[in-house]
């Protein structure tokens, strides 16, 4: 497939979420170009479709891609998923995280705006910061922690991506949609960068201790990756979504200690739960969010869809692939 064939461009398309999105787009009959530097993604994530005649993989950074202008100009739509992610990476490599999430997004938005290509920009629930609201909606005020704690650099970088995207929408009429993803999980997610569910499942399958950081009372809502993909596709196909921000997440809430116990029970594991102080797991002064539950009424209103795959089913499907 040549670069000027009409296609959907997916940055980060060899990553966890991106690879599932690519499979869905191909199944829908779309031609797809993946632009990925494979820093966190991998060719293996695309092994099921690597020989597909409507798929092309371009390896490299967005900012270093000599074909970027052509790839964007001939695109029918762009999904910008490329980013530096994961708590471990954020804490250990803050410069890399900030540079990647800010610069690569700006380059992509410039190209998309020049050609007026409908674009979805993936943000994160991390932008809600330290707010203690029981559930977060898109219009809420955001409370970010201090810059001395590198964890908040990731949230700020993604929030700046949102500001950039909306600025391009306002000044250059870019048809853009921002999505705040809440703990997307499922097959192909790796625990290498601190992702909790694959880490728990891998340990439970070996009957090893499940290490819970802090007191385990922090709660999260876990969204199955195919539910996230369904929401992304529906938003891209909805002109009413453009210029807006949407939460994408499941509303079934569980503490991390509860998640560990649920994994043990679902897999019939002999593992035990082991609590580890944040200072031992990360750096002294590490901050965390106590709750992170989305309000998805806006998503449901615009797309007539809300993620509903149960946590038990998510654990089962994910465990089959680890």
Predicted regions, residues:
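N-terminal Rossmann-like NAD(P)+-binding domain of SDR-like oxidoreductases, especially those catalyzing
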Residues: 1-182
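Amphipathic terminal alpha-helices
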Residues: 6-7, 297-298, 310-322
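Hydrophobic "lid"/C-terminal helical patch
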Residues: 21, 232-236, 260-263, 315-322
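Residue-level signal for the nucleotide or nucleotide-sugar donor/cofactor binding architecture
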Residues: 41, 63, 92, 100-103, ...
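A short C-terminal helix-loop "cap" of Rossmann-like NAD(P)-dependent dehydrogenase/epimerase domains
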Residues: 53, 138-145, 173, 200-212, ...
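Glycine/proline-rich active-site loop of Rossmann-fold NAD(P)-dependent oxidoreductases
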Residues: 132, 159, 174-175, 184-198, ...
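C-terminal "lid/loop" region of Rossmann-like NAD(P)-dependent oxidoreductases
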Residues: 215, 245-246, 257-260, 268-291
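Conserved C-terminal active-site "lid" loop/helix of NAD(P)H-dependent oxidoreductases
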Residues: 225, 258, 279-306, 310-313
